[in-house]
Curated annotation (Swiss-Prot):
Signal peptide: none annotated. Belongs to the phosphoglycerate mutase family. BPG-dependent PGAM subfamily. Homodimer. It comes from Bartonella bacilliformis (strain ATCC 35685 / KC583 / Herrer 020/F12,63). This is 2,3-bisphosphoglycerate-dependent phosphoglycerate mutase. InterPro entries: His_Pase_superF_clade-1, His_PPase_superfam, PG/BPGM_mutase_AS, Phosphogly_mut1. The gene is gpmA. The lineage of its organism: Bacteria, Pseudomonadati, Pseudomonadota, Alphaproteobacteria, Hyphomicrobiales.
Length: 206
């Protein structure tokens, strides 16, 4: 019996190309982002996958990516559960700011610490650990039970919420996880053993 989880970071958003801190702000996908999502769906269909249930965040860039993926897989009516527990990390006072402007205001080193530290949050925002504190319970209580019942599950979310999830799935340290980079619109496929250990991991590049 297959126990499969597919993770996809949303396609490129309008704020990605403007070099802005996005966080819980809600910009739409760019045309490139829509193409990335469509390509992801085609590649997942080509890989022979069919989802039993799908999860996404409360933000439209993730929701629309999920919808494009499911349309390409001929599953447009599949149940898509939306929850803010899967939202991007909240960047607090950095949200909406240009990253270069933020470096000028607070200094390059401080901004780098806020972006890449596991425990240090920007003013009025979340650290990666804070993000994990909402992602992990939601995954274990709501999503993992489907996988353990040998279902195939899709999660479309964000760079940091997925990074936090990958940390627990792969047993990575706080030092290792902050170095992980996730490309937009690129599916990561995990197969699990009955005891929830990873049997295989595959990244589908277009």
């Amino acid at each position: 019996m297959r126990r499969t989880l597919v993770l996809v970071r949303h396609g490129q958003s309008e704020w990605n190309i403007k070099n802005l801190f996005t966080g819980w702000k809600d910009p739409d996908l760019t045309e490139k982002g829509r193409t990335e999502a469509i390509t992801a769906g085609k590649n997942l269909k080509k890989a022979g996958l069919k989802f039993d249930i799908a999860y996404t965040s409360a933000l439209q860039r993730a929701q629309k990516t999920a919808q494009h993926i499911l349309e390409q897989m001929a599953q447009p009516d599949l149940q898509l559960i939306k929850n803010s527990a899967l939202n991007e990390r909240d960047y607090g006072d950095l949200s909406g700011l240009n990253k270069d402007d933020a470096r000028q205001r607070w200094g390059q080193e401080q901004v780098h610490i806020w972006r890449r530290s596991y425990t240090i949050a920007p003013p009025n925002g979340e650290s990666l650990r804070d993000t994990g504190a909402r992602v992990w319970p939601y995954y274990f209580h709501h999503i993992q039970p489907h996988i353990l019942r040998s279902q195939t599950v899709l999660i479309v979310a964000h760079g940091n919420s997925l990074r936090a999830l990958i940390m627990v799935l792969e047993g990575l340290s706080s030092e290792e996880i902050v170095l992980q980079e996730l490309a937009t619109g690129v599916p990561i496929i995990y197969e699990f053993n009955a005891d929830s250990t990873i049997l295989s991991k595959k990244i589908i590049q277009s």
